[in-house]
UniProtKB/Swiss-Prot annotation:
SUPFAM superfamilies: Acyl-CoA N-acyltransferases (Nat) (SSF55729). GO terms for molecular function: leucyl-tRNA--protein transferase activity. It is found in: Cytoplasm. It catalyses: N-terminal L-lysyl-[protein] + L-leucyl-tRNA(Leu) = N-terminal L-leucyl-L-lysyl-[protein] + tRNA(Leu) + H(+); N-terminal L-arginyl-[protein] + L-leucyl-tRNA(Leu) = N-terminal L-leucyl-L-arginyl-[protein] + tRNA(Leu) + H(+); L-phenylalanyl-tRNA(Phe) + an N-terminal L-alpha-aminoacyl-[protein] = an N-terminal L-phenylalanyl-L-alpha-aminoacyl-[protein] + tRNA(Phe). This is Leucyl/phenylalanyl-tRNA--protein transferase. Pfam families: Leu_Phe_trans. Its EC number is 2.3.2.6. GO terms for cellular component: cytoplasm. Keywords: Acyltransferase, Cytoplasm, Transferase. It is an enzyme of class 2 (transferase). Its main location: cytoplasm.
Length: 204
């Protein structure tokens, strides 16, 4: 921490955050109540190839049933609160105060977006991420109703392809994401993918 700066004053400026993403770096916190963040540049990066997304048959059925109303950028605060709640299998969360503030600021200037699943007028799942050039950097997702976040992910991939995005960065891979086609790539390969994605501008 910088000398003379209290934890309550710690913040991440939007320009700094976007520069970090442009070089393959992103912030995390150890715990939700941590006053600061640390910066991560993984040796191996998780990505979902937009031409290699795998949709399980059970999810296809759920989508056809039309259970969820999908909205974009409708309730950022609700989505990040859902992601930070740390319920169920995600008993811990890395989303602290500075991260909430930083991504809200990016949302307000058009560089952070949400995909939301609504059911009976309630937000029941969603995800958020950062956009820069033709890249989407997925940050976190949550679900309060079965398959809600999965439907959001499927919608996100379809939307990114339609809009001309070329990179969906998941930061890390998990068994859950691998079911949908997520793979790990070495840092050098990722940086080439990122360089290509930053060459161009598309609208979310």
């Amino acid at each position: 921490m910088t000398a003379g700066v209290s934890p309550d004053d710690y913040s991440i400026e939007p320009e700094l955050l976007l520069r970090a993403y442009a070089t393959g770096i992103f912030p995390m916190a150890e715990e939700a109540d941590d006053p600061e963040v640390f910066w991560v540049r993984p040796e191996r990066r998780g990505v979902i190839p937009l031409d290699g997304f795998h949709m399980p048959k059970s999810l296809q059925k759920t989508i056809r049933q039309g259970i969820f109303d999908i909205k974009l950028d409708n309730d950022f605060d609700g989505v990040i609160e859902g992601c930070a709640s740390g319920t169920g299998e995600r008993a811990r969360t890395w989303i602290n105060g500075p991260i909430r503030e930083a991504y809200k600021n990016l949302f307000e200037i058009g560089h952070c977006h949400t995909v939301e699943a609504w059911h009976d007028g309630q937000l029941v799942g969603g995800l958020y991420g950062v956009t820069l050039g033709r890249a989407f950097f997925g940050e976190s997702m949550f679900t309060r109703k079965r398959d809600a976040s999965k439907v959001c992910l499927a919608y996100l991939v379809q939307h990114l392809v339609k809009q001309g995005f070329v990179l969906l960065d998941t930061q890390f891979t998990t068994p859950h994401l691998e079911r949908f086609g997520a793979v790990e790539v070495p840092r050098k390969k990722y940086e080439k993918l990122l360089e290509n994605a930053l060459d161009g501008i598309v609208r979310f």
